[in-house]
Amino acid sequence: ALENFFPPLQGWLLRNVGAYSVVRGTMDLPCFRCTRRLLAAGEHPVVIFPEGEIVGQNDVIGAFQPGVAQFAFWALDELRAASQGPLPPVYAAPVTMKYLLPGDVRPALARRMALMERKLNLTDPRTDLYDRLGKIGEAVLAIAEREYGLTPAPGGLFNDRVQAAKAAILARVAREVNVTLRPDRTTIDHVRMLFNAVDRITRAAPAPTAYARKLQREHQRRVSALYVDLWRVLRFAAAFDGYNPDRLTQERLMELTNRLEWEVLGSLRWVGPMTAVVHVGEPINLTAYYDEYRRDRQAALAMATHRLAAAIQEKLTELNARMTPLAALTPAGAP
């Protein structure tokens, strides 16, 4: 996204490795044209992050966006217009990345949990790290419920309270930016939609008069505060959604600690060292979907996107077996 190019050193590095920016939430036509030209020329690969949003979970993928297939089909449109011959293949190579912890990071995680416990005035730390993390999560959720004016049902389940908190925060942001949330979309879809809406307001062209610009800046300052709410929803989703504690690994425990530490302390630190496993899968020829694309655009985009996502999730599931289950580690303090 464009904002990643603003820090001078980071922007310089991104430009010099061949990255170019996209303005989120807009029809960024210069970016789209550049991508089409690169793919049509076929001289350089284009790397695209298909989920479109950070989900903060190392062992599952988020919902893929159709942009990868769409760019390929746009490039094929250009190639078809330029030549009457057979269309060349346009390949998408599914790349899977998995981060693993080769050493025992429980002592480091325990120290970070202790810091969060002090910040939350939790004076009864547990010995089991997952139990301690659950207590921290409970305290964080209770504080968030008070701040957002939520009253949980008596005896309400923790996961139900998390879902209610996320829904309430998203509804609040949607009201502020005048966006209607669709009930058939996921939490991540709603977060992406609202990020885009906030981006459009905070990065709008200056108003034509001095007084209008003054009001615009005031509105932009109010709306900018909503970024905090949206990141909170993402942290809640990453920390609490879709994981079974019976199959807990130290990689997942580290991720849970990271998200809660980011929420409580406002910083995100990794423990290490870490090993990155990168797998480049069999390239998928998206030209094979082009005839279907010309007949039914949405169906072809859905089929191609599903195949790409399935290829990456299949490999990721295989790599998940290389994570270290907590049950397999020597109990803390044992010889």
Each model region followed by its residue ranges:
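Catalytic core of membrane glycerolipid acyltransferases/transacylases, capturing the structured
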Residues: 1-27, 81-86, 102
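Membrane-interfacial terminal anchoring regions of lipid-handling membrane enzymes
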Residues: 29-46, 56-66, 70, 74-335
